[in-house]
Amino acid sequence: FDQLAVMGVNLSEDMSAEVDKELALRQLSFAQLNDSPEVLNALEEKMIEPLCRRLRQTGCSGAFVLLDATVNTRMEGAEHSRAGLYVQKSGADTPTVPLLLYRGSAEVGKDHSVMPHRKWRMEFQTDQFPDYDRWMTPGSAPLYQSYTLTERFELPGTSEEVQLFLLPLRGRDGTMYGLCGFEISESYFKQNFAQPAGFDRLSCLLAPAGDGLAADAALSSGTTGGYYHAPRNTLVLRSMGGGLT
């Protein structure tokens, strides 16, 4: 996942720069993006092409940028509603695979040949976003030390299980603009990370690591020619000797 880290840092820098430029152009503070649908729409218009380009260049199933602002602070549920873009690959990971808009302005998406997802909504719901408040806590660590992998969760409105590779969006002055990163779906991981091993049965996990591997919060795959059993408990790491764990 070194590529994800590099591309994630590039994505964060690109998206933060777009926000910085738009705020400077309009002489606004970031807080003034709330209740400014015209400005938020202009930002999405500028962000969608570089976001789609990064998605096509990266081994993942989706890419997103979430801004900590909403088009209407007076609507019901506005405290959890956030603007941004979330784009997914609609099929096999090929250079020309069509892209779908899961979150963001439908008009902006259509103008760039990104059609709305069947579960499209205009804005993110942060109460359905894993540990949103935690990831939005300002930090000073450089971007290459600031990425993280969420636990597996069900993408709202779908039956797809995903993990998100997250990075912060920070302004030149350190203001937290939001989050960005990449999606790795369960189906994508199974298809693209099955191992060409000589074993009949092999389990591969993408899991948050701590004292052990939280298998119940992980994505899993097997071998290209066999089958596997996906564990659902926390796995404890033990040395087997000879440099093996």
Q: How would you label these PLM feature ranges?
A:
Residues 64, 163, 180-181, 204-206:
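Structural recognition of the beta-strand scaffold that forms the well-ordered cores
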Residues 186-245:
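Intrinsic low-complexity, intrinsically disordered coil/linker regions enriched in small/polar
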